[in-house]
Amino acid sequence: MVIPLCAAYGAQEHGDARKAIDILRVAGELTEMRKSYIVEETDVKNAKEKIEIDRVIEVVKTLPTQSKTVLLACIYILASGKDSTISNMYQVYRLLCAALSIDILTQRRVTDLTNELDQLGVINSTLQYKGRYGRSKKIMSVSSKSSSLEILLKDFRMQPIEKIPIEAFIPKFKNW
C-alpha cells in the first residue's frame, strides 16, 4: 500500500508523478534512518510532512525583511491567544518594526504581504463577514510555526529582538 499512498499524495496537489517519487525517496531515507528495509505507511506520511516543512522553511528563508516581520507578528499574535485579526497583528507588527529600527509599512501594504504569505502556504487566514460591521481577515495558523520562528530569529536582521519576550510586543488594549 506504500506506492499507491505515495501516488495518492502526489495526485492530491497537482497530479505530479515527480511529487510522488520525491515522497517515496524521502520515505526510503526515513526507513534507512530507523535501520529498516521495509518502507511503511507511517514512513510515507512522515515523508510528506517533512517535505512540507522543508518547503515552508525554504520559503521563509528567502522572504524579504518586511515579509519576515509580518510573519513574526502573525506568530506572536497567535501565541498571545488574543484575537488574531489583521488590525491586531498590525499593532504587533508596528512594535516589531520599532524594535528592529525598520520602516513601518501602511496597514494596507501589511495586508497585502499577509495575503502573499497566505498564497505561499506559510500562513492560513480567513475572511470573516460581520454583517453591517464589515469584514475582517483573521489569521488562523502558521505552517510549521516552531521551525518558522527558529528560522526567523536566526536571520541577522531579527537579532535585536531575539532575547525580548513575546509579551513585550503584545499591546495592552482595552478591547483585548
Question: Model-predicted segments: where are they?
Answer:
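Conserved AAA+ ATPase small/helical "lid" subdomain
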Residues: M1-E52
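Winged-helix-like regulatory helical subdomains adjacent to P-loop NTPase cores
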Residues: E41-N88, V92
